[in-house]
């Protein structure tokens, strides 16, 4: 979501307030009216929605509101209520083993998630529509429909056969990151505890970036290492983005970006979308015992991907019990605001947007 003026930046905050607790922020009637009028003229997008993962849950209906349920943060009723016109819906594949068989599984998983997105769009043409250009997005909003841009988080589905990228582009892919939590065949991750494998992009990664940028796919540096950022800037004839990242000056985490690179990003014409993933906003101070207890709890429900929507309330209550036994610091809207205000001060609103990481741990 590209902000081009401070008034637009303000409008985003006002619109964002709809998703925050009622006590969190207060605005005057005039401010809200100004924000509403501005939003009606703008296409308001979130640059990183992990909602396609939710589409694969048999017990979740994205057409129904699931307010208060941690397993579903984005649905059609709340998009309408919160004035979110749409966003980039992520084809996400978790980084696992890197065997030939695993890469084939990743290829199939990615294509299946892409199919889920298209199935939703085809089944609900009055509510969702695919966008591939800003002009399309504007027309979709004018029709009262939600915008579905397609992004890819982790390029692992392309390792087995990089030419599949052409299929993704033809089916709407317009934003792509090279890597996720762990190093892969294309790039080093910012968070792999083993450290750098390629010292940035691998030879295959450099080739993939060039192949993606040629038809117009924007490269997303989020989750990649600092060395990957530096190489993307050097290699890319067009701007890159960080679809869901934070400010390292506010919280020193490798997933966040330092001020020097923020300024380079801006000079290169790029944009950072500030994310709301608590672990990247503040240090929770979780003890090893807390981490082990939380893992055991999630495993009891079969892992995050297999938790039933009906069990989410019980899971939330159990996590609160863990908070009492093993206190941690939880990120707040003030912490998010600190990151947002910092990057605005460093590079200006024309280089700042919002990528909340909803349905992927954000919020």
Regions from the PLM with identified roles:
Residues 23-198, 252-363:
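N-terminal hydrophobic targeting/anchoring segments and the immediately downstream early-domain regions
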Residues 44-51, 224, 242-245:
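Histidine-centered catalytic micro-motifs
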């Amino acid at each position: 979501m590209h902000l081009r003026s401070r008034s637009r930046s303000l409008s985003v905050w006002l619109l964002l307030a709809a998703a925050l607790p009622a006590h969190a922020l207060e605005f005057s009637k005039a401010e809200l009216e100004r924000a509403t009028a501005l939003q009606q003229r703008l296409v308001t997008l979130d640059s990183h929605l992990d909602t396609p993962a939710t589409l694969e849950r048999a017990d979740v209906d994205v057409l129904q509101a699931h307010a208060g349920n941690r397993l579903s943060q984005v649905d059609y009723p709340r998009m309408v209520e919160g004035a979110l016109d749409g966003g980039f819906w992520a084809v996400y594949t978790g980084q696992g083993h890197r065997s030939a068989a695993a890469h084939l599984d990743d290829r199939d998983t990615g294509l299946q998630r892409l199919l889920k997105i298209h199935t939703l769009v085809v089944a609900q043409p009055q509510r969702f529509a695919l966008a591939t250009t800003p002009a399309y997005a504007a027309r979709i909003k004018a029709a009262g429909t939600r915008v579905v841009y397609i992004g890819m988080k982790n390029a692992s589905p392309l390792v087995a056969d990089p030419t599949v990228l052409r299929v993704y582009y033809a089916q709407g892919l317009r934003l792509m990151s090279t890597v996720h939590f762990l190093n892969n065949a294309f790039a080093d991750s910012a968070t792999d505890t083993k450290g750098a494998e390629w010292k940035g992009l691998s030879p295959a990664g450099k080739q993939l970036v060039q192949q993606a940028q040629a038809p117009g796919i924007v490269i997303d540096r989020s989750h990649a290492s600092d060395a990957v950022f530096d190489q993307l800037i050097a290699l890319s004839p067009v701007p890159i983005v960080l679809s869901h990242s934070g400010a390292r000056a506010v919280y020193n985490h490798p997933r966040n970006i330092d001020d020097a690179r923020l300024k380079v990003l801006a000079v290169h014409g790029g944009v950072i979308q500030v994310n709301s993933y608590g672990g990247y906003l503040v240090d929770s101070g979780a003890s090893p015992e807390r981490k082990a207890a939380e893992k055991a709890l999630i495993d009891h429900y079969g892992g995050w991907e297999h938790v039933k929507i009906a069990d989410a309330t019980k899971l939330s209550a159990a996590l609160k019990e863990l908070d009492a036994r093993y206190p941690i610091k939880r990120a707040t809207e003030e912490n998010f605001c600190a990151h947002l205000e910092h990057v605005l001060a460093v590079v200006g609103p024309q280089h700042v947007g919002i990528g909340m990481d909803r349905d992927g741990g954000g919020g």
